[in-house]
C-alpha cells in the first residue's frame, strides 16, 4: 500500500500531508469593521448549531490521529465565546498538538495572555489596520484601539510570536502602512498587508 493511501494521514490534492487545522469557534465579533460587517451586525448562527467545545475537542483528537499537529483558533472573534481559555487549556493537552495559535482582534485578549503563554500558545495573528485611534474607530466603528494595543504589548512581553494582519484600503488607511511596517524594525513583529 502506498503512503498516499494510508488511512492514518490526510493529504491535499498535491499529495502533501495535512498537518494544520483552522477551527472557527464562533461567527460572532465585537467589532463592526465596515469591510466585514454592516454596522447593525449580521444574523449569527444559532448557538445550538455551533459545535460544542466537547465536539471540537473530539474532532481535534480525531484529526491528530490523521496527522494534524497545528491548530489555529479563529472566528469571528474567538474571545467572544464564553470559556475559550479553559477550552484552549484542554486543546493544549491533546497529545500530538505541538502548535496552538489563534487569530484575534485583540479587544478582549490581554487579560488572557499570561494563561496563553503558560499553556504554550506559540503565535497570535492580531488584526490591526491602523495605529491611529480615530481611523481605528472609523474602520471598526468601535473605540477599542487602547485595548488592542494592551494586547499587542502583552503578547510581546510574554514572548508569544506576533503577526499583524492589516487590511489595506485606499482612501482609508494608506497613510498607516509605513507606521505599521516600521514596527518590524523596532520589535519582533511580522506585518502582513492583505
Specify the residue positions occupied by each region the protein language model found.
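Conserved alpha-helical substructure of the radical SAM core
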Residues: 2-99
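Generic beta-structure capping elements
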Residues: 26, 38-39, 127-131, 194
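Radical SAM/AdoMet-radical enzyme domain recognition
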Residues: 53, 57-72, 80-182, 190-192
